[in-house]
Amino acid sequence: MSKPPTFVPPACARAERLVTERGEFAVLDARPAGAVRGTALLVPGYTGSKEDFIALLEPLAAAGFRVVAVDGRGQYETPGPADEAAYARPELAEDVLAQAAAVRGTGRVHLLGHSLGGQIARAAVLRDAEPFRSLTLLSSGPAEVSGEQQQRIELLTAAMAAMNMGQVWDAIQAMATPEELAEPDEDGTRAEAALRARWLLHSPAQLTATGRQLRTEPDLVAELAACGLPTQVVSGERDDTWPVELMDDMARRLEADRVVIPGAEHSPNTDNPADTARALAGFWSAHA
């Protein structure tokens, strides 16, 4: 789970509802003060939300990019149905295509997905690459997650079947290590209340369906490479969801731009947002 430094967007961003042909999605829409060099759509990961990218918005807008971070269906402030079928991978991919259509205007969109969001973004590109100028896979591997993470997802799925979301949150916090607990917010308060509020709005059906996808995702790297879309693979220096070496190999197979963010683990977007934003802006500028 990414832990954003705050849930309050910067002055350059507005919290809005993005209207698409597949419904409305909660977004943070950050815009540059001057000319727009490109538009990027950011897709969050498992248990995440648009706020996971909040520390990237200001530096990317300052670099000239409009950045739209989205809550997928069933994530935080985008409601979703209780039917797991609504969160099948093709459905989520179509959502991304609809979001891209709503923000792209006359140009194409830089697409970024973090963790699970990277695999959803990949599925969208495989369905239709035309709306996209580039793809960034941020801490998102080629296939299923590590064995340890599969076990954690299985435990979470079982807990959601037996308890309500508040009880599940309390159990997660009770088992967390000190390093996994929420850090103080930028204003000195604990971020735990905001993280808990986000968790309570997640759809259990979404978490169950996408958790299953993370445990069973096939390797589609060859298919993605065949699309010919400029691709960037970004990770931290270590990652317990997909080993860094696995992402190195994926980048080679994709002939992708490869960036390792110093001091970061599974969430470079929150662990080291300055270097992450710099890497993204450089890649997007090269493929404007």
Where are the regions a protein language model picked out?
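Alpha/beta-hydrolase fold catalytic core
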Residues: 1-40, 62-65, 201, 285-288
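Active-site loop/oxyanion-hole signature of alpha/beta-hydrolase fold enzymes
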Residues: 21, 62, 68-112, 278
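Conserved HGGG/HGGXW glycine-rich cap/lid loop of the alpha/beta-hydrolase fold
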Residues: 26-80
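Gly/Ala-rich beta-loop-alpha elbow adjacent to hydrolase catalytic centers
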Residues: 113, 117, 121
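Flexible "cap/lid" loop of the alpha/beta hydrolase fold
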Residues: 122, 126, 132-163
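Conserved alpha/beta-hydrolase catalytic His-Asp/Glu region
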Residues: 145-151, 165-225
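Conserved loop-alpha-helix segment in the C-terminal half of the alpha/beta-hydrolase fold
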Residues: 226-264, 270
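Post-His helix in hydrolase/transferase enzymes
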Residues: 270-282
